[in-house]
Structures are given as C-alpha cells and as structure tokens.
A protein has these predicted regions:
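Compositionally biased terminal segments of proteins
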Residues: 1-129
C-alpha cells in the first residue's frame, strides 16, 4: 500500500503544502480491511468521470479524512490507465511507518491525472529532485 497525493507530497518534503485528506492506494483486500477497521464506508464507484476504483471508501473517523482506493484507474485521452507505483519509500511518522511513491513517480502520476491542480503539483514536486 502507498500514501499518495497531497499527503505523500508533504511526506516527501514539501512543507508548504496543505493536506485536506490522505489518499491510500492498496489491494482490494487491504482496502476493505482498512475501511472496516477505521469505521469507514465503502462507496459504490459508478466508473464515470476521471477516476474509478474497484474498491473505494472514505474514512471520516480520523482527524483528517482518508480516501482508500484499490485498483484505481484514471481516464487519460479517452483510455483507462491503471494507477500503479514501482517504488515504495518508507517514511517514519509518529513511531510508525508509511510508504509513499518516489518523487519521480509522484510527478508522473500528477501528469497522468492531468488536471490543472495536478500539473501544479507536478511543478511543485520538481523542486524536490
């Protein structure tokens, strides 16, 4: 599993970035277990729009909302592309460990998502290379 999105950007070293939620990408089994363990709710994904996931859930019982996705895909150029990460960088947080994609993979993912806010994120992440 990986933390990605804005939270991963901060964990990678962007200290001036606002994190409204934590995005987690994991397997369908782990997604269901995490959502259940933190009293979240699995939400049916209509598969429309820019993103779709085999399992999607929100956890609102935590200090910051958590969005959990499994087998997430993004629509780019009319085609669906699976969101995957090759790297898994450990980051120590409050005596535990979280995993994030490398900065280079975070940049690639932002570009794949392609929204203006994602392209801005890619630009900000370039500072860390």
């Amino acid at each position: 599993w990986w933390v990605f999105g804005g939270a991963a950007m901060v964990l990678a070293g962007l200290t001036d970035w606002r994190v409204p939620d934590v995005d987690v990408l994991c397997s369908p089994r782990d997604a269901k277990a995490l959502i259940d363990a933190l009293y979240g709710e699995v939400t049916p994904d209509p598969g429309e729009g820019l993103f779709r996931s085999r399992v999607y859930g929100q956890i609102l019982t935590t200090p910051v909302p958590v969005e959990v996705m499994a087998e997430m895909e993004v629509r780019n150029g009319g085609d669906w592309h699976m969101v995957t990460f090759e790297s898994r960088i450990p980051v120590a947080v409050d005596g535990g460990r979280l995993y994030i994609p490398s900065v280079a993979e975070q940049i690639e993912t932002c570009k794949l998502f392609g929204r203006p806010k994602d392209l801005q994120r890619a630009e900000q992440l370039q500072r860390l290379l």
